[in-house]
């Protein structure tokens, strides 16, 4: 009986670890500063680009002037990086599968944005953009330093400055929010 209890306890402890998603694995890798595998990197980048494009298309419809301007830049730039990544994969330089849809985490964020309006939309959108770009910069830095595919590693290094600029733009947009909100109330 005691062995059964111990075995059950071990399974209960191990189950969450076995059920980790790619994002959680790369989250742990991020904390440790470890480069993701090529397949994890490709998947995370593709999902990130899809999220950036879709959330920014919403901002083009629902956002204020500053959010719309930022969103237009994000749609342009992330469409470009998506096309480049697809070219690396389809050209055979990178052996990985590209996801065709958002994962559940990003889909729920997108659904939250779809439901928001006005200043609530702007606050959510801006917060999500800062967070997404911090994650992207970290992901690209780690792969550019320690990735195992030379072509993808080179691309990550070349793409990184644009992502760092996006992060700065998102942070500036976030800093401008309280001032814009106060100005709108007058």
Where are these regions (language model features)?
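His/Met- and acidic-residue-enriched segments that coordinate or traffic transition-metal cofactors
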Residues: 2-6, 19-186
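N-terminal signal peptide c-region/cleavage motif recognized by signal peptidases
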Residues: 14-16
């Amino acid at each position: 009986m005691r062995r059964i209890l111990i075995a059950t306890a071990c399974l209960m402890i191990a189950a969450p670890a076995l059920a980790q998603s790619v994002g959680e694995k790369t989250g742990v890798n991020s904390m440790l500063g470890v480069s993701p595998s090529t397949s994890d990197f490709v998947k995370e980048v593709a999902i990130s680009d899809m999220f950036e494009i879709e959330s920014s298309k919403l901002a083009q419809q629902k956002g204020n002037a500053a959010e719309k301007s930022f969103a237009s830049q994000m749609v342009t730039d992330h469409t470009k990086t998506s096309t480049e990544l697809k070219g690396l994969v389809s050209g055979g330089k990178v052996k990985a599968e590209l996801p065709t849809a958002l994962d559940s985490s990003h889909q729920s964020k997108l659904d939250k944005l779809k439901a928001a309006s006005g200043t609530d939309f702007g606050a959510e959108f801006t917060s999500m953009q800062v967070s997404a770009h911090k994650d992207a910069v970290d992901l690209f830095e780690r792969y550019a330093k320690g990735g195992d595919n030379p072509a993808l590693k080179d691309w990550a290094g070349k793409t990184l400055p644009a992502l760092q600029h996006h992060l700065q733009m998102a942070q500036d947009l976030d800093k401008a929010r309280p001032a814009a909100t106060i100005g709108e109330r007058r």
